[in-house]
């Protein structure tokens, strides 16, 4: 027997590094970095990072629910009318709620087989493009979309932290999971695959 070959499968997910993005002159929003580290066979890529905003999480939950009607999906953090993107406590509570949501989703084998989830986690595609890709209306497959994004973004935070611990590039400071950074729109990820599934809210 080779014990090293019998390692239990795992999927780890972090939601971190909230950043304020400018949508236009009057409007801004916060997006979050979603990082995946896994040895699961259902994922094409074993590490990835991508940026998503709250509205995209709402779309994902509706999409997953429409494809798994009998599954009780976890709740997202509620949309607070008094949410203040400059309030660190508000931002971190939402970040933690989004992370808890994804952790519970990734524990469900049926949800884990949905290609929409994998494209959400490991590609730069928006909701409309995810729907088109999953339904076979694009020139690229789910796996190709993920690989393409992986080639564009070869970075994973744990690797950075290992090599740059002294450079303050970790889970603390201003752009950490509980901090709040500012930047222009940017996405980073590395891919994963499986099967299909709705529509933007």
UniProtKB/Swiss-Prot annotation:
PROSITE patterns: PX. A 1,2-diacyl-sn-glycero-3-phospho-(1D-myo-inositol-3-phosphate) binds at residues 53, 79, 94. One of its GO terms (biological process) is bone remodeling. One of its GO terms (molecular function) is 1-phosphatidylinositol binding. Gene3D superfamilies: Phox-like domain. The keyword Ribonucleoprotein does not apply. The PX domain mediates interaction with membranes enriched in phosphatidylinositol 3-phosphate. Interacts with ATP6V1D; may play a role in ciliogenesis. Belongs to the sorting nexin family. This is Sorting nexin-10. The gene is Snx10.
